[in-house]
Amino acid sequence: MATFKDTCYYYKRINKLNHAVLKLGVIDTWRPSPLTKYKGWCLDCCQHTDLTYCRGCTMYHDCQWCSQYGRCFLDSEPHLLRMRTFKNEVTKNDLMNLIDMYDTLFPINQRIVDKFMNSTRQHKCRNECITQWYNHLLMPITLQSLSVELDGDVYYVFGYYDSMSEINQTPFSFTNLIDMYDKLLLDNINFNRMSFLPVALQQEYALRYFSKSRFISEKRKCVSDLHFSANVIENLHNPSFKIQITRNCSDLSSDWNGVCKLVKDVSAYFNVLKTSHIEFYSISTRCRVFTQHKLKIASKHIKPNYVTSNHKTSATEVHNCKWCSINNSYTVWNDFRVKKIYDNIFNFLRALVKSNANVGHCSSQEKIYEYIKDVLDVCDDEKWKIAVTEIFNCLEPVELNNVKYALFNHEVNWDVINLLVQSVDKAPQILTLNDIVIIMKSIIYEWFDIRYMRNTPMTTFTVDKLRRLCTGVKTVDYDSGISDVE
């Protein structure tokens, strides 16, 4: 069993404060929740297990036991997970407050050790100091944390996480903040705690302490669509879909890193708990992570042969053509915005190809096809620009005064004409590479303007931000019939 979980189970009994704070799902009545194949550490009980998604942020960081309480590290209620979560600039004083909280909730002194030793020895054959019987006394105080960056804000969730080498499929990475504190001072705190333990347990305590306090921090991970609930991902192709989340809230102070100090004043802590309540939010899916997911799915179904075809219909409306017909049964095409982008991009590219190459039918095999598969995913800017550059080179542009030009004299639809006028101020006869980049980005930005999107969804906002946005009715997306430009 996880050390942190064991420790909470036993220390929960020592006083009223601990009974309120150390309440974990894994040590209460089990309520089943959907299991997934995502492996990682539950932020609530610190055990490595199969995770389910959090109802507060939709990321995978809860185990099936702890999910019954719906706690999130972004809550504004002073539960243990929130008090262990620090944000952005963490000072030495903040870490000192964290250590004080650990020492308050998980004290090790002669009275506590005797209490646990006596209760354990009441059972037969338990006169030896075997690790598994005293796991709750072997949790050292460390500055080990799991950290994640969410649109410029870095969150550190402190705890005692066993088996650091296990598979981690979450966006959280191990970070050691001992260098921001004082190694010798932390050593002294733990040696004092260790001195109350029987000699047989001291070595195990020391090994655990040094293994969790001297490790090298991992490189921070990038948050992707894989880290969010499958229920959300499955509904992304519905333009009117909103994510429903719940947050545990209370009247907390604005000092994010100072919440852990509440345990030093028991009456103040319980007064704050009296204001606890749940808030519900309906959140837009509009963000770069989810937009890229949709564009990547659409990219898998691209039929590049359309750019050399003579079809009179738009790219998504071609039927009974072996080379150009897309399968409209895929859910990605349920989002009319993706269809609109696909139609306009391919209408523009076909005009470019027809203006510069002598290709008469979509059955022909052209080199340009291999680069067209990446024209939708504008979120991967470097890869996208390489693809557009290669497409431009395939047009065999003419060079004048060190600038290459491609002809543009083939008909396009009215949507593309309007975007041409908006982006390059006219309906041109010739285009440079830069013009083509601007036009193609304008076609995509009309519906998904990633320049003004946050990277992760608003489900990763703090409660304060959600409240401010909710006041202005900005937590929901634009009306499904209006583009980003409008």
From Swiss-Prot:
The alphabetical list of record keywords is: Host cytoplasm, Host cytoskeleton, Host-virus interaction, Inhibition of host innate immune response by virus, Inhibition of host IRF3 by virus, Inhibition of host IRF7 by virus, Inhibition of host NF-kappa-B by virus, Inhibition of host RLR pathway by virus, Interferon antiviral system evasion, Metal-binding, Phosphoprotein, RNA-binding, Viral immunoevasion
Please give the residue ranges the record annotates as the region Zinc-binding domain: 42-79
The highest taxon in the source lineage is Viruses
Report the locations given in the UniProt record: Host cytoplasm, Host cytoskeleton
Q: What InterPro entries does the database record attribute to this sequence? A: Rotavirus_NSP1
Q: Where is this region: RNA-binding?
A: 1-81
- Is Glycosyltransferase one of the keywords UniProt gives this record? no
GO terms (molecular function) for this protein are: metal ion binding; RNA binding
Post-translational modification remark: The C-terminal region is phosphorylated by host CKII/CSNK2A1. Phosphorylation of the DSGXS motif is essential for host NF-kappa-B inhibition.
Region annotation Interaction with host IRF3: residue ranges? 317-486
Q: Which HAMAP family match?
A: ROTA_NSP1
Q: Which family does it belong to?
A: Belongs to the rotavirus NSP1 family.
How does the record describe its quaternary structure? Interacts (via C-terminus) with host IRF3; this interaction leads to IRF3 degradation. Interacts with host IRF7; this interaction leads to IRF7 degradation. Interacts with host CUL1 and CUL3. Interacts with host BTRC.
This chain belongs to which protein, by name? Non-structural protein 1
